[in-house]
């Protein structure tokens, strides 16, 4: 896939402004920045990554395995100029919702929230998102992952979600498509889901948004995602190997793994049940520096 060149009034690349201003379907917060997100993976969704991304107006979705006390400490030690670019991540377990509510009690903050599950089509996911929205009306809520327009509409209209995370299996450390045969071509998924999200208008003309998650191995892939209409693009592998990632440097390389990989299961003491398949892999990526 290539983009056809178009006529432009831009005389130089330095005239290009890649910042965006967004209003949201449910949350009445406004957001200004560069709509590129660091993925909420163990290795990339770190406090260090969040600080660096915030400095340049990018987003970091923290991974969900931080201890509550560490999250409260991080959030209360930083001001809004940083926190508007940080997303609190969680799954859909009851214990994670309890943790989120305790975070609010301890910090007094309603954070931007990323509700992340492997299968956004599971029964109860929309209900869970709606429950979070009921208690966190001010938060910008992003949820996924899905890959089809009907679920995008369902999450926005009935789940109280502002941004739908789109992508089933395109990540460089994900093997879902190979193991299960489930997925949808990523560029097509973004294109079709964007039409569904942008077609939904609230009473004051705010519409749903889409974040393309996965499939970006080169800068050109990010460009194509935006060309397909994505409002945000999420990166994992492209940011892996930097100083801000969680991992040791061994022979000039750093470890990067998918969140459904055996490495992730072992790290977080997830039981290897007979019904649970490994849908991610562990790779070594070159160390890239800061």
Predicted regions and their residues:
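N-terminal capping/small domains of soluble enzymes
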Residues: 1-87, 257-259, 271-290
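Alpha/beta catalytic cores of nucleotide-metabolism and tRNA/nucleoside-modifying enzymes
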Residues: 2-11, 159, 181-290
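Active-site-adjacent beta->alpha loops and helix N-cap segments on the catalytic face
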Residues: 12-14, 65-79, 93-102, 117-141, ...
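Short beta-strand/loop segments at the ligand-binding rim of alpha/beta enzyme cores
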Residues: 29-38, 80-89, 109-112, 132-147, ...
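Short glycine-centered, acidic/aromatic-flanked micro-motifs in structured strand/loop junctions
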Residues: 40, 90, 117
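Catalytic cores of alpha/beta
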Residues: 49-50, 97-104, 141, 147-166, ...
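Alpha-helix termination/capping residues and helix-transition junctions
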Residues: 55, 105-109, 135, 157-160, ...
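Glycine-rich phosphate-binding active-site loops on the catalytic face of alpha/beta enzymes
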Residues: 55-70, 112-122, 162-180, 216-249
């Amino acid at each position: 896939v290539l983009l056809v060149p178009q006529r432009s009034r831009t005389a130089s690349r330095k005239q290009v402004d890649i910042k965006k201003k967004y209003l949201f379907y449910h949350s009445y917060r406004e957001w200004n920045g560069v709509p590129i997100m660091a993925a909420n993976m163990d290795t990339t969704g770190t406090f260090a990554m969040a600080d660096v991304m915030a400095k340049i107006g990018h987003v970091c979705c923290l991974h969900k395995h931080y201890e509550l006390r560490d999250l409260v400490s991080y959030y209360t030690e930083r001001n809004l100029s940083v926190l508007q670019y940080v997303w609190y991540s969680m799954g859909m377990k009851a214990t994670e919702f309890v943790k989120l509510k305790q975070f609010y009690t301890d910090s007094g903050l309603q954070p931007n929230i990323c509700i992340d599950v492997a299968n956004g089509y599971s029964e109860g996911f929309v209900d869970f998102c709606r429950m979070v929205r009921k208690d966190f009306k001010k938060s910008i809520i992003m949820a996924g992952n899905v890959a089809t327009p009907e679920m995008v509409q369902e999450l926005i209209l009935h789940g109280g979600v502002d941004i739908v995370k789109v992508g089933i299996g395109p990540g460089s450390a994900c093997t879902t498509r190979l193991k299960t045969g489930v997925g949808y071509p990523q560029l097509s998924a973004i294109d079709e889901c964007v039409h569904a999200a942008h077609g939904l208008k609230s009473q004051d003309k705010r519409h749903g948004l889409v974040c393309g998650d996965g499939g970006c191995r080169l800068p050109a892939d990010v460009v194509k995602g935006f060309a397909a209409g994505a409002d945000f693009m999420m990166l994992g592998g492209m940011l892996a190997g930097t100083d801000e990632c969680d991992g040791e440097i061994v022979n000039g390389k750093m470890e990067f793994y998918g969140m459904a990989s055996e490495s992730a299961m072992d790290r977080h003491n997830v039981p290897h049940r007979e019904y649970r398949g490994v849908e991610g892999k562990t790779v070594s990526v070159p160390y890239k520096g800061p």
